Amino acid sequence: MKILVAHNRYLYRGGEDTVVDAEVNLLRQHGHQVWVYSRDNAEIQYLTPFEAAKTSLWSRQTAQELQKIHQQFSPDLIHAHNTFPLISPSIYGVAQKLRIPVVQTLHNFRLVYPQAMLLREGKHWEACVGKLPWRVVIHQCYRQSLSQTALTSTMLTLQRLKGVWDKQISLFIVLNQLCREIFARGGLPMDKLRIKPNFVESHREPQWQHRRGGLFIGRLSAEKGIDVLDSCDRCLLQRATAGLG
């Protein structure tokens, strides 16, 4: 199968970027032809605020580049990962025009909550999921910015009104059952939500005997629960830390 993988990379490499690279390698190992279309948030520094806002709603550059890729590669399927802000919803419109089915992996909750991580003032927050975004805008939930929250909410509202989720995306991939329920509550069609967890490539068999302690894998930041890790760490007699970044 010929697969076009589309991903908007973050300014600082994170879990989503790692997952995309791992999936591309896995697909190629199984004989699929994969073309990776990526844009990088580092590009934003060259845009004016108006240009950045306009691009997040509809990117002419993305639309033109996808048309060229179709002429060269003619993919059977588009697998979209993060599309915010530079790839933009234009990828869905182009795919529909070219009659290419789209599978969308939802790595975070941005489609139902602009802040993307279901957090407000550092605490878990689901009250705005599935409702009109006026509360989100008032509370400035995205980067504590009224303008940026309003822009992101506008993008999501336009997608909903245009029927993007129902008409232009064939299937959504979520990471677990809880995510599936939250996205369904947020308005995504339940029959299009499929569960596929992330994976780690390893050729070692896990050894369960004589193990002690715990393992934390993630970015050392507040939203990842670093306070919980710290409180648990105090109970351990020994600890080891390894990481990148």
What are these model-predicted stretches?
Residues L178, F199:
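Carbohydrate-associated surface elements
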Residues I173, P206-K224, D230-R234:
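Conserved donor-binding/catalytic core segment of Leloir-type glycosyltransferases
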Residues D40-N41, I217, Q238-G245:
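Glycosyltransferase donor-sugar binding loop
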Residues V5, Q67-I87, P101-R110:
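Short N-terminal targeting/anchoring amphipathic segment
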Residues R39-K68, F73, A80-N82, Y142-S153:
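A short, charged, and often flexible helix/loop element on the N-terminal side
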Residues M1-A42, Q71-F73, V94, L98-P101:
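N-terminal subdomain of nucleotide-sugar transferases
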